Design a protein with these regions (language model features):
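Beta-rich, blade/repeat-based domains predominating
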Residues: 9-32, 49-64, 68-70, 91-105
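A short beta-strand motif characteristic of beta-propeller blades
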Residues: 2-9, 41-48, 81-88
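Loop/turn residues immediately N-terminal
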Residues: 31-34, 70-73, 113-116
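Short loop/turn segments that connect beta-strands within beta-propeller blades
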Residues: 1-2, 37-41, 77-81, 121-125
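Hydrophobic "anchor" residues
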Residues: 3, 43, 64, 73, ...
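Short active-site-adjacent structural elements
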Residues: 73-75, 84-85, 92-95, 116-118
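Blade-level signature of beta-propeller repeat domains, shared across WD40, Kelch, NHL, RCC1
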Residues: 94-125
């Protein structure tokens, strides 16, 4: 029963968002979305987002929704492509951590200072 450091790597700079999969963690930091293998501790960058990542949620298809504090919400694909879904920064609405309900295709985004949770129903084009 001893506490010890599990991972200490400079690539994980200012970590904030975290999402647990079966065999790895998905980490969002001040710039990158990356994975960390739970057995080997090996880090792999998925995407260069360029700014701080707050929320991370899986879509159940190998992609990840991410949010940042300024109000952007995006979908990140396995090869690193980033599709911006929402930008609420002009309305001064932050995007905090988020949650995706796969069975209902609903993305929940707490807005922090706006004092509400917004639910978005995702519909295929």
């Amino acid at each position: 029963n001893e506490v010890s450091i599990w991972l200490d790597d400079k690539i994980v700079s200012k970590p904030n968002g975290i999402f647990a999969e079966d065999t790895y963690l998905v980490l969002g930091n001040s710039r990158f979305l990356e994975t960390c293998d739970l057995k080997s501790n090996k880090l792999k960058i998925i995407a260069d987002y360029g700014k701080g990542i707050d929320g991370i949620a899986a879509d159940g298809k190998g992609n990840y929704f991410i949010s940042d504090w300024s109000g952007n919400t995006s979908l990140v694909f396995p090869k690193g492509e980033i599709l911006q879904l929402l930008d609420t920064s002009k309305q001064n609405i932050n995007a905090a951590d988020l949650c995706y309900i796969t069975e209902k295709n609903i993305l929940l985004i707490p807005t922090f200072f706006d004092n509400r949770v917004i639910a978005y129903k995702l519909i295929k084009d």
